[in-house]
UniProtKB/Swiss-Prot annotation:
PANTHER family the UniProt entry points to: 50S RIBOSOMAL PROTEIN L32, CHLOROPLASTIC, LARGE RIBOSOMAL SUBUNIT PROTEIN BL32C
GO cellular component, one term: large ribosomal subunit
Family: Belongs to the bacterial ribosomal protein bL32 family.
GO molecular function, one term: structural constituent of ribosome
Pfam annotation, one family: Ribosomal_L32p
Lineage of the organism: Bacteria, Bacillati, Cyanobacteriota, Cyanophyceae, Synechococcales
Organism, scientific name: Prochlorococcus marinus (strain MIT 9211)
Keyword Zinc: no
The protein, known as: Large ribosomal subunit protein bL32
InterPro entries: Ribosomal_bL32 (IPR002677), Ribosomal_bL32_plant/cyanobact (IPR044958), Ribosomal_zn-bd (IPR011332)
NCBIfam families registered for this protein in UniProt: rpmF_bact (TIGR01031)
């Protein structure tokens, strides 16, 4: 079984943790932006399935 030779320093651990948190923040920001784009109805990059019942009512 692979075992690390030395203990990782707190600085290195914090650096890795901050990178992980930054990536998560960027992903959350992109998801929020995408959600806002979909809700406005002006997004051109999506194809929405249209229910036949909705077309009949209109």
């Amino acid at each position: 079984m692979a075992v690390p030779k030395k203990k990782t320093s707190k600085g290195k651990r914090n650096q890795r943790h901050s990178i992980w948190k930054a990536k998560a923040g960027i992903a959350a920001q992109k998801a929020l932006s995408l959600g806002k784009s979909v809700l406005t109805g002006r997004s051109q990059g999506f194809v929405y399935p249209i229910d036949e019942q909705e077309e009949a009512e209109e």
